[in-house]
Every structure is written in C-alpha cells, then in structure tokens.
C-alpha cells in the first residue's frame, strides 16, 4: 500500500539547441578563403573588403589574409575586412 500521494507531472524540461553563434576568427588572425569569421543573426557586423555574406548573415573570407575589425560611418557600424 502506497504511503505517498502520487506526484503530478511537470510541463517543463525543454530547451532549444544552442546555435553556436559568435566570432570564430578574431582581429589579427590569419584566415584562408572560405573561412567563417562570424556567425550571427542579422548584421551585427557588416561585410567589408574581401568579406562575403551568406544568406544567414554569416561573414566569411573571400581571400587569404588577416582579419581586421573597424568601426565606420555616422552610425558606428562594425565592419570586418581581410587585409591581404
């Protein structure tokens, strides 16, 4: 005979899988063409010289070189470029 009242069930216990966003190659690091520099949602960082942008706003290197972060424009936008 049970001496404990039955416990109810919970409706919690779920979470989405992390998307691993963020900067993958930092300023001054060497990259090869095709290397992913940043994975992001929206354009937190904008594509500069020798940097391409994927349809999910991923920034990637178009040429070999070094990563350079810079802030430009009236809106202080962050740009990422590749210096050959």
Curated annotation (Swiss-Prot):
Region (Disordered): 1-22
Residues annotated as transmembrane: none
GO terms for biological process, alphabetical: translation
Keyword Ribosomal protein applies: yes
A GO MF label: structural constituent of ribosome
GO cellular component, one term: cytosolic large ribosomal subunit
Alphabetical keyword list: Ribonucleoprotein, Ribosomal protein
Xref: InterPro entries: Ribosomal_bL27, Ribosomal_bL27_CS
Pfam families cross-referenced by the UniProt entry: Ribosomal_L27
Claim: Zinc is one of the keywords in the record: no
Signal sequence annotation: none
Entry's family note: Belongs to the bacterial ribosomal protein bL27 family.
Protein name: Large ribosomal subunit protein bL27
The species this protein was found in: Shewanella baltica (strain OS155 / ATCC BAA-1091)
Lineage: Bacteria, Pseudomonadati, Pseudomonadota, Gammaproteobacteria, Alteromonadales
Gene: rpmA
